Structures are given as structure tokens and as C-alpha cells.
From Swiss-Prot:
InterPro entries given in the database record: 4OHPhenylPyrv_dOase, 4OHPhenylPyrv_dOase_C, 4OHPhenylPyrv_dOase_N, Glyas_Bleomycin-R_OHBP_Dase, VOC
Species annotation: Rattus norvegicus
Lineage: Eukaryota, Metazoa, Chordata, Craniata, Vertebrata
Key words of the record: Dioxygenase, Iron, Metal-binding, Mitochondrion, Oxidoreductase, Repeat
Annotated family: Belongs to the 4HPPD family.
Location(s) in or outside the cell: Mitochondrion
GO biological process: aromatic amino acid metabolic process
Protein name: 4-hydroxyphenylpyruvate dioxygenase-like protein
Catalytic activity: 3-(4-hydroxyphenyl)pyruvate + O2 = (S)-4-hydroxymandelate + CO2
């Protein structure tokens, strides 16, 4: 591996000036402003909840935004993942030797609190770039060049990033998996026993309706780096687009489709977000009518009626449960969304929940089209 990622520092978005993403992250999802930078036509606002940090880059300018680049993408998008590495200069040399393109070479930024060094690497995943950051010893609240903002305690709904899901073109997962392995040290994480890394986990969603292929990647076991999930469509017999194909069309190619945010209490978090105006996906009614679903929910210590009212999905076995709720898209283009996830011993993603998400997205698309 050329530059093993040690932890996720932040996820960056690029949106037009005035787009409400930063406001919504605060008002609906409980993120709190951490630091800001305004220069050269850019307004860069870092927001935090627990260890999860989002950097919202608004506007455009003659120079690149600090710690990233301007993707010149036609729609709002999650455009950058920033990872901490041990030595940026060494990582850049190793990546260059592998043929990687670095639109921003190793750059040092200094302020009164210390120094950080970063480089930006183009990835094969659409408009997604990767920032490799070295900031050991930096004493500021975020990064050099940013002005710290007064810290106000938030509701604590989100503790950290659980996983990152990339929407990929059909057949591209093996190539992407090798790239992330060779360049950042990610390894295949089986989602089912005996899973072939080249094939991933196939989740069929219905007769003739295709499905999804999921390939999960992680760095070292017990690492704080979130799991990376590659999602691509499986061909079906109908012309109906699934959520991955819809993302590729509306986003203009592959990219970061959603971020799974870990919550220690999905009941409180989903209820609070809904009261704040959050738009959560409604699971299909049949999901809660499945044989054994009520008993499964009761065994987890929850009330079926409440989970259904909040749109919370539950999957699991014995004493290990997975609870998930998904937002509608944060952008008008109906692309990127967020997921809240609470794990009660479960480590996977729940095939039944994946099918329910697929159907929820299809039903939401049908409602939007008035069909």
C-alpha cells in the first residue's frame, strides 16, 4: 500500500453560494459550527458532531479551496474525503510511483497553532478526490487557515462516521477495490461467509427487478477509519432505474452516494431530526408486516409501532441487531443522502434493510413523478 489511511478527518462538500446544506446540518442534524475560512471567493465552514466533521465549501474562486480542490461539478456534491496519514511527502512519492494524479502537490499551511501538510489525489470514483493530511502536533480546533468558532454543545445525536457508500458504474467495483487497496491500504471485508472479493454481496430485490452488488472495504481491524462500501446495480429485466442508476444519472457519474452516521440512540436522533424538519424516507408498509418482524423488533427491546412511525429499519439475529433510518436527499437534484445507524452487536448492513431501502427509494421516485 502506498499511503495507509489512519483515520478520517473530514468529508467535504462543494455547493453553490446560498445552498442550505450548512444550515440544514446545524438545524436538522445537530452539527455545530467548528471553524470557518472566507477567502478568494470561497466560504469554507467546518461543522462537527462527535468525531464526524463535514466541511462545506460554498462558492468558487480563481484558486482551489484550502485542503481540497474545485471539482467544477454541475450539481452540489460530496466531493472529497480527507484522511490522516503519517507522512504526506512520502505518501505523495509512493502514489506518484503508482501513477496517481495529484492536482495539489504537498502543501504546507501554517498559523499560530502549528502546521499541517496536505496533498490532494484524484480517485477513479468519479468526482471524488482524496486529501491526505499530516497535522501531528497542530493545536488548533480544526486546521491552519481557519478561524475557530465558539463551541456550542449539540444534541449529540451523531458520534462518528460508520461507513461511506460510493455509487459505482456496473462492473467497476473490482477495479475500485484494487485502487483503494493499493493506494490507501483498504482490504476486502466480507459481508457474507465465503464471499468472493471480485463478486461482493449480491442483494436481489425481486423477480426480474435486478438488485445491488455491495463490496465492503476496511483498513486494519479495529481501525477508526470508516468502512467503505462500493455499490453498483445488478441488471434486471425491466427498464426501471434503481437508486444507484438514478444517482449516476442525476449526479452526472459515480460519487459518494451516502454517509452512514453512527448514533448511540437512533430513537432520540430520528425523533429529534423529524421534529426539526428532517425529511426521512418512509419504508414500504410490507416491511413491518413480514413474518417474524414484530417478534424480532420486540426481542430487540423496541416497539414495532414506534419503529414504523419513525421509519426505522431493524435487522439482526439473536442478540445482535442493526437499526437504520435514511433521509431523503439533501440536494434538490435528489442525489446525496444521510443514514443514521445504530449497531447493537451487529457488524454488517442487513440484506432485508438493503431491500427495504431499495423499495423505499423506488416508491419515493414514483411519488415524485406522480405515478
Amino acid at each position: 500500500m502506498a499511503a495507509p489511511a489512519r483515520r478520517l478527518c473530514h468529508i467535504a462538500f462543494h455547493v453553490p453560494a446560498g445552498q442550505p446544506l450548512a444550515r440544514d446540518l446545524q438545524r436538522i442534524f445537530g452539527f455545530q459550527p467548528l471553524a470557518v475560512r472566507e477567502a478568494g471567493g470561497w466560504r469554507q465552514l467546518a461543522l462537527r458532531s462527535g468525531d464526524a466533521v463535514f466541511l462545506v465549501n460554498e462558492g468558487t474562486g480563481p484558486r482551489e479551496p484550502l485542503y481540497g480542490l474545485d471539482p467544477h461539478h454541475s450539481v452540489p456534491s460530496a466531493t472529497n474525503l480527507c484522511f490522516d496519514v503519517e507522512d504526506v511527502d512520502r505518501a505523495a512519492r509512493a502514489l506518484a510511483a503508482r501513477g496517481c494524479i495529484m492536482p495539489v502537490p504537498p502543501t504546507r499551511v501554517r498559523d499560530a497553532q502549528g502546521t499541517a501538510t496536505y496533498t490532494v489525489v484524484s480517485s477513479p470514483a468519479g468526482n471524488l478526490s482524496l486529501t491526505l493530511l499530516q497535522r501531528a502536533g497542530y493545536r488548533g480546533s480544526f486546521l491552519p487557515g481557519f478561524r475557530p468558532l465558539p463551541c456550542t454543545p449539540g444534541p449529540g445525536w451523531v458520534s462518528h462516521v460508520d461507513h461511506l457508500t460510493l455509487a459505482c458504474t456496473s462492473g467497476s467495483s473490482p477495479t475500485l477495490m484494487r485502487w483503494f487497496h493499493n493506494c490507501l491500504g483498504f482490504h476486502h471485508l466480507p459481508l457474507s461467509p465465503g464471499e468472493d472479493p471480485e463478486l461482493g454481496l449480491k442483494v436481489a430485490v425481486g423477480s426480474g427487478r435486478g438488485g445491488l452488488r455491495l463490496t465492503a472495504l476496511q483498513t486494519l481491524p479495529n481501525s477508526t477509519v470508516p468502512t467503505l462500501v462500493l455499490a453498483e446495480s445488478l441488471p434486471g429485466l425491466t427498464s426501471e432505474q434503481d437508486q444507484v442508476e438514478q444517482f449516476l444519472t442525476r449526479h452526472g457519474g459515480p460519487g459518494l452516494q451516502h454517509v452512514g452516521l453512527y448514533t448511540p440512540n437512533i430513537i432520540d436522533a430520528s425523533e429529534g431530526m423529524a421534529k426539526a424538519g428532517g425529511r426521512l424516507l418512509t419504508p414500504p408498509e410490507a416491511y413491518y408486516q413480514q413474518p417474524g418482524k414484530e417478534e424480532q423488533i420486540l426481542a430487540s427491546g423496541h416497539k414495532p409501532s414506534f419503529l414504523e412511525r419513525q421509519g426505522i429499519l431493524l435487522d439482526g439475529d439473536k442478540d445482535e441487531f442493526l437499526l437504520q433510518v435514511f433521509t431523503k436527499s439533501l440536494f434538490d437534484e435528489d442525489t446525496f443522502f444521510l443514514e443514521l445507524i445504530e449497531r447493537q452487536g451487529a457488524t454488517g448492513f442487513g440484506q432485508n434493510n438493503i431491500r427495504a431501502l431499495w423499495q423505499s427509494v423506488q416508491e419515493e421516485a414514483a411519488r415524485a413523478q406522480g405515478t
